[in-house]
Amino acid sequence: MKQTLLSLSNLTKQFDGKKVLDSLDLDIFDGEFITLLGPSGCGKTTLLRMMAGFEHPDDGTIALGDQDLTHTPPEHRPLNTVFQNYALFPHMSVFDNVAYGLKMEKRPKQEIRERVEDALAMVQLEDFARRKPHQLSGGQQQRVAIARAVVKRPKVLLLDEPLSALDYKLRRTMQVELKRLQRELGITFVFVTHDQEEALSMSDRVVVLKDGLIQQLGTPREVYERPANLFTARFVGETNFFPGRVDKANGDDTITVDVFGLKRTFRKPDFPVSGGQSLHVLLRPEDIRVLAPDDEDGVAGKIVERNYKGSTLDSVIHLEDGTEVLASEFFDEDDPTFDYRLGEPVKVSWVDGWEWLLPTEPEALPEEEGTDA
Amino acid sequence: MRSLTQQPFRAAVLVLVWGWLLFLVLTPNLLVVGASVMTRDPGSFISLPLTLDAYRQLLDPLYLEVFLHSLYMAAMTTLVCLLIGYPFAWALSKVGKRNQVLLIFLLIVPFWTNSLVRTYALKLILATNGLLNNGLMSLGVIDGPMQLLYTEGAVIIGLVYLLLPFMILPLYSVFEDLREDYLRASHDLGAGRLSTFIHVIVPLTLPGVLAGIMLVLLPAMGLFFVPDILGGSRNLLVGNVIKNQFLDARNWPFGAAASILLTLAMAFLMFAHRLSKRRIGEDGV
Amino acid sequence: MNRWLPRTYLTLVYLLLYVPIVVLVVFSFNDSRTGYEWGGLSLRWYEALLNNRAMVQAMWNSLWLALSAATVSTLIGALTALALHRYRFRGKKVLNGMLFVVMMSPEIVLAISLLALFLLVGLQLGYVSLLLAHVTFCLPFVVITVMARLSGFDERLPEAARDLGANDFTMTRTVLIPVIMPALLAGWLLGFTLSLDDVVVSTFVSGPSYEILPLRIYSMVRVGLKPEVNALGTLLLVFSLVMLILSQWILLRSKR
């Protein structure tokens, strides 16, 4: 069912001796919404620009179906881009901007007019055709940029952090809008962002990138709940890392792990474990339970910060050994013990089975943040 | 982006630009440097052997006096431009935005008008029986006409008149960038008007002052037609000397050496300007 | 006082700047021969000007020189600005520096160096030498004007055009040139005016075969008063004013 549309293999690129992409392989399926997620300098923009044809890989190939695009100039690729700051032609009207790509294809005038009008109607800008870009709001410019790219009916639409210039509320609206467009058009979207929330809420699949290497490729849920490594776990969402030590491996596909002196039974992870081995126990803030200090379960600590977030109450708890724990609880107004004061002693626990285990990694030396290429 | 189809275009542009600058800027300047260390020759302008005679001649009291006088007039011109221009630029930056555009426009209109013609217009005013003298006499302020034309003052007035916009424009641009917050912050921290001026306004506008000096001082030594029209034979600029040596006296080595003097002055001013910009954290050009 | 002092001061300085120009214009209509007294309204100096064949010839020569110098320097200057903006190449800083030095150097230094060059290579002083010289001193101004426009230019625009199917040439024609057009026009007008106004450089590199207006004016005003100059100056003033308004209008319109 899932058919590969765009196939990237062994892509390698260096800028001034620095590896931006390192033998990267990625298959993009037909009709999916895939997001390239990572911090600045991770190579996501370079990767996107390579698909568009603005950068050339030092090594590797880009293929669309069975057509090799590696050396095809951008104007001959059936892919179109929505640029970060829209890149609308300032000297052309909205209509002429959208018509530009069709004029390049030398389409008949009548057809151009109809298709441009359709595209503008699709982004609800049919009344703005004669305006110049600078007479539009940021959100409207964004819509024009999208209309201009999709009017050519590309096989793949490349979106380079298209929402980063919009304010929070507008960004949410545009996220929904983009999802709707993608469903209606059935075009494959490749979306670049450094905003993990955006990536999780919009995508069918997320590619987490760091230093030109794919850290993880999976559905938003997989990436969030089962991060492949510490980087992904840290980058996507907030996470508590508890130090654990394997006590013993049980016969029934479970292991017993010592966490803060508590013996907990976890499902056996998919990496090999042996007794005495250290590992990380990952728990999302929403998986943490804050209990009364006289509860028999849990680790003792005290509340050092309480942040009211509307639907949730976020706390920071200092355990006795100094570990900092983030907890995010949904309101339960019927629970009288729910609210704790600052400095109040509490116990911290979680439901077994919600944890995620990762092996310890040799800590990489802290590296200078590169520029986003 | 750097596709192969662009390479010939890129190469052609670079060759054209480099060619133009090498042939019409670098080579000619090297020729001048070369000429300045050669011997004067009535037939072919210059000839061997190499000599530093031209530079020695610069120190000849006769010429030294002319140069110092020229430097004095240029310095006076610059000072007058600065004294008029600094408050002017300040006041201009305080005017409402709409009027500012118009006022800037009015400032550059004279700059776009032929400078010879404008110098000549000054002559109409300053001449012995010109408008100023006639006006003052009919008002009874003076009894007989003053000698205004063909004086040092006339040359300075002419130079100021031609060069004032070049002082004002860079000053205006630094005053435009001078944010009101700085002044408020300074007042807020207890500085009075005078100490705010000395400690905040002056350092921040210094690059503009130096740019203005650079744009006024050097031309004020080179615009030879101003003394020709207003100054008579006793108020010459370095420019007049160079022109005479090249076109009349045919002493190329000496003219070349004099022009190198001007170039060195330029280099010095550019260096000072860079330094002042770096001090307030802007990149020098 | 706080409001009136700066305004009075501004007005005073503008007055000083404009008095000579007003005097010039008024006296261009003066019937008097001596030049200092008012002798009634007349167009005689304009008539004299237009009947002076050498003067009219010099005017045409100047106009043609300014047109060609502005055009050539805009072409080369625009290409230079594009190269500086788009390409990375060795010696870019040197190139930038050289342009800056040309702009800042006293005109007379440029003038004698070009004279030396032209004599060395045996170029007949005339139209060609004037053109080469004028293009050289106009060049940095054009480069700066175009560079300023390019620095505000979104790097993604050419890419967007390519992305939508334009090849390099089409992109240049449909996007790059239209976007930098105002700067090209402004640069051209600046070059035109600089060329038309130049005395210093032209004094050195022109020959008897090609007399231009500033030099003709120069020889007229060096001694005594020539009322025709008033008329000529007024004409030049009107001409530059039209050009200036045109250029400002273009720049303002493009900013919208």
Curated annotation (Swiss-Prot), chain A:
Enzyme nomenclature, EC number: 7.6.2.11
Primary enzyme class: translocase
Domain annotation ABC transporter: ranges: 6-236
Family: Belongs to the ABC transporter superfamily. Spermidine/putrescine importer (TC 3.A.1.11.1) family.
Listed GO CC annotations: ATP-binding cassette (ABC) transporter complex
Catalytic activity: ATP + H2O + polyamine-[polyamine-binding protein]Side 1 = ADP + phosphate + polyamineSide 2 + [polyamine-binding protein]Side 1
InterPro entries: AAA+_ATPase, ABC_SmlMolc_Importer, ABC_transporter-like_ATP-bd, ABC_transporter-like_CS, Mo/tungstate-bd_C_term_dom, P-loop_NTPase, PotA-like, PotA_ATP-bd
Gene3D superfamilies: 2.40.50.100, P-loop containing nucleotide triphosphate hydrolases (3.40.50.300)
Name of the molecule in the record: Spermidine/putrescine import ATP-binding protein PotA
Subunit structure of this chain's protein: The complex is composed of two ATP-binding proteins (PotA), two transmembrane proteins (PotB and PotC) and a solute-binding protein (PotD).
Classification via SMART domains: AAA
Keyword Cytoplasm annotated: no
UniProt keyword annotations, A-Z: ATP-binding, Cell inner membrane, Cell membrane, Membrane, Nucleotide-binding, Translocase, Transport
Residue runs in coiled coils: none
Classification via Pfam families: ABC_tran, TOBE_2
Organism: Marinobacter nauticus (strain ATCC 700491 / DSM 11845 / VT8) (Marinobacter aquaeolei)
Membrane topology: Peripheral membrane protein
GO molecular function, one term: ABC-type putrescine transporter activity
Subcellular location: Cell inner membrane
Amino acids binding ATP: G38, P39, S40, G41, C42, G43, K44, T45
Role summary: Part of the ABC transporter complex PotABCD involved in spermidine/putrescine import. Responsible for energy coupling to the transport system.
